[in-house]
Amino acid sequence: MESTLQAEAPSKRRGGEFAAVPLHADEVRSALKTVIDPEMGLNIVDLGLVYDIEVNGGDVEVQMTLTSPGCPMGPYILSESKAAVESIDGVVHAEIILVWEPFWTSDRIDTRVRSLMGL
């Protein structure tokens, strides 16, 4: 289940000044679409690796998985995911939680992308 909670968070911009900036799970999802799985050549959202996004003020928690427990690019993908979320104006803290249930299968790939891939 995905959170669409809107919260007020301090802005990290404007040279230390703070301003209320509403954060949305959709903004987090958009930022995560910039993270590409190097082995698959697709972003982690369209791959279906992002399971849940929770926004609470300036804190963001993302539950995600990898294509396999032995994914050699796992540390890179997790690090890039955290950096992408932390780059959003208003995010103070990002936590990326790696989960293995439900286990990822190619059925989780976005239907539009699956169609383009011929799956």
Predicted regions span which residues?
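Domain-level signature for proteins that mediate thiol-based redox and metal-cofactor handling
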Residues: M1-L119
